[in-house]
Regions:
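Metal-dependent peptidase/peptidase-like ectodomains
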Residues: 1-71, 80-83, 87, 136-196
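Generic structural signal of hydrophobic/aromatic residues within well-ordered alpha-helices
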Residues: 17-20, 118, 125
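Sec-exported extracytoplasmic/periplasmic mature domains
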Residues: 22, 26, 52, 95-106, ...
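A glycine-rich phosphate-binding loop feature that marks nucleotide/adenosyl-phosphate handling sites
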Residues: 37-47, 110-121
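His/Asp/Glu-rich mid-to-C-terminal helical/loop segments that flank catalytic regions of hydrolases
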Residues: 67-119
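Surface beta-strand/loop "capping" patches
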Residues: 121-141
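Long mid-to-C-terminal assembly/interaction modules of large eukaryotic proteins
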Residues: 201-208
Length: 208
């Protein structure tokens, strides 16, 4: 698994997972480096079919180390290779993650990473327009294309701000919900949960 444990997820879960890791207590020490989040999910992974069906997903990532190349699905992945510390860390890590997700009123999806990738793609398109070999081929159309790119960048900037504002609202709902649960205010928590059903449905439709 390399030098650290990793949670691989869809882009939209990254913010929530990073916040989750930041608030973790000390877990079993199995790696020299701290646990990290990586994205996106990979097409060969079992959870890919879930994500494209509209279910936000995450998995225990193990493609960053040699295990995938030397042991996975082979006769070498046996009792001798078993590591007690790694076993305990991953059970602690994902058990606490399940509890954290269980204490959310709204699915904690943050769409700004997707918009950031769109913005990066537009920057790359603009850079290509200035390449000498492309400039000659585009001719007068280059300026039109650059104007369209600028227009799309402006729209993506607005979308990025909106995504961040929306996530702050989601995070606020979830903070309040968690506090209600911890304080035993179950009726209020249930009321907040019901209040946010429409919002959650919109988020899941947007994800799909």
């Amino acid at each position: 698994h390399g030098t650290r444990a990793r949670i691989r997820s869809c882009y939209e879960y990254v913010s929530f997972l990073e916040e989750y890791l930041a608030d973790l207590p000390n877990l079993t020490m199995a790696y020299p480096e701290e646990t990290a989040v990586t994205s996106p999910i990979e097409t060969w992974s079992d959870d890919f079919s879930m994500a494209i069906a509209g279910v936000p997903s995450m998995v225990n990532d193990f493609t960053g180390g040699s295990f995938m190349e030397t042991h996975y699905h082979s006769q070498f992945d046996n009792d001798e290779f078993y590591d007690e510390q790694v076993y305990r860390l991953h059970h602690e890590l994902f058990a606490l993650l399940i509890l954290a997700l269980d204490e959310t009123a709204v699915v904690p999806l943050q769409f700004s990473p997707v918009v950031q990738r769109i913005h990066k793609g537009l920057e790359q398109c603009r850079d290509i327009c200035y390449r000498a070999d492309v400039t000659g081929q585009l001719g007068d159309r280059r300026q039109i294309l650059l104007e369209k790119i600028e227009e799309l960048e402006s729209l993506s900037d607005k979308a990025l701000r909106k995504c961040r504002e929306d996530y702050e609202q989601i995070a606020e709902y979830n903070r309040n919900y968690r506090q209600m649960l911890h304080e035993g205010r179950d009726a209020e928590a249930e009321g907040l949960y019901e209040q946010t059903r429409e919002l959650e449905q919109k988020l899941l439709v947007k994800f799909k």
